[in-house]
């Protein structure tokens, strides 16, 4: 009887240890994911995502893919800041905005300016193309090049949707952003309350 009790007790102890270990492992993995997929600049992202009717998770996905949240990064193609905006694109976007202030390219190092104009660009592209993936192609490769791809039957059968992305860099970029997007949606709940963005961990 006593021996049977010891066996049952041992089995229960093993189960508890396994459950605790699994829970600890799950918590550790979650913490690691949140470190890799952070939420920063909530006030700025919330304001601009709300103004341009964007999913904050997508904005964060683009920022992570473009700059890994480094404010002062400059690419070898001359793209600046968090959302990696080039000077010609920045100048063009300023003609589409109603801002009273005229900015210089150095202002793209400022998160509030970079995110504002990056969100404006995303909004324009999402309104122009039929899918998020095609809009992201244009964000990376430019609207002119995407227009050429859509006109080519080798890449688009209907002139609206790309079934093949001919540039490996752009293909990898779109895949990275969409993966980021999925993870941000899984990790966080973005809630609008009185026009203010609230971020909660799921």
Say what each PLM segment does:
Residues 23-202:
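Catalytic glycan-binding domains that act on GlcNAc-containing polysaccharides
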Residues 1-3:
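N-terminal Lys/Arg-rich, disordered targeting/topogenic segments
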Residues 6-24:
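Hydrophobic membrane-insertion alpha-helices, especially the h-region
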């Amino acid at each position: 009887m006593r021996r049977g009790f010891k066996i049952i007790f041992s089995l229960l102890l093993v189960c508890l240890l396994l459950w605790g270990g699994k829970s600890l492992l799950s918590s550790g993995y979650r913490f690691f994911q949140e470190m890799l997929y952070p939420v920063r600049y909530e006030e700025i992202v919330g304001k601009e995502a709300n103004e341009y009717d964007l999913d904050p998770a997508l904005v964060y996905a683009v920022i992570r893919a473009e700059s890994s949240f480094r404010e002062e990064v400059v690419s070898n193609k001359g793209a600046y800041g968090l959302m990696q905006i080039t000077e010609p694109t920045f100048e063009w976007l300023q003609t589409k905005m109603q801002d009273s202030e005229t900015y210089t390219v150095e202002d793209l190092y400022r998160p509030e300016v970079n995110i504002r104009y990056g969100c404006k660009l995303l909004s324009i592209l999402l309104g122009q193309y039929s899918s998020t993936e095609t809009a992201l192609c244009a964000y990376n490769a430019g609207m002119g090049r995407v227009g050429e791809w859509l006109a080519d039957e080798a890449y688009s059968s209907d002139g609206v949707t790309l079934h093949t992305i001919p540039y490996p860099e752009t293909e990898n970029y779109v895949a990275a952003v969409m993966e980021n997007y999925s993870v941000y949606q899984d990790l966080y709940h973005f809630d609008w309350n009185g026009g203010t963005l609230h971020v909660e961990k799921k």
